[in-house]
């Protein structure tokens, strides 16, 4: 099983608490992390909770996302040693987009800049 397949099969519910913890450890809030997820994927609070309750894997989390934000192409930079804009695998790129946005939140970047609207 290659690394991408391993990530695809990971439950979003298993990773979500780490996103929240990363934000909170740096003085940011769960609400801000959730807002980033809503912005990126189009999920709302109820739909996100359903994904968590169902233990949906990352592949389906992104494939079933209500509406990926049209401004995702504005997300650039390096995360986990990869330039997000150069990742060719569409699901892996979306995973890294989310990682990048949560990382920016934890680094203290203003929400207006993170959300790139």
Task: Explain the meaning of each model-derived region.
Residues 1-117:
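A charge-rich, low-complexity, intrinsically flexible signal that marks solvent-exposed coils, linkers
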């Amino acid at each position: 099983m290659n690394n991408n397949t391993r990530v695809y099969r990971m439950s979003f519910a298993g990773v979500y608490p780490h996103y929240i913890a990363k934000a909170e450890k740096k003085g940011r809030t769960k609400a801000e992390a959730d807002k980033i997820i809503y912005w990126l994927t189009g999920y709302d609070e109820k739909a996100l909770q359903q994904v968590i309750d169902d233990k949906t894997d990352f592949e389906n989390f992104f494939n079933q996302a209500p509406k990926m934000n049209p401004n995702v192409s504005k997300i650039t930079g390096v995360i986990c040693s990869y330039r997000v804009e150069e990742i060719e695998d569409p699901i892996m790129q979306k995973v890294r987009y989310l990682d990048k946005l949560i990382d920016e939140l934890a680094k203290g970047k203003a929400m207006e800049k993170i959300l790139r609207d």
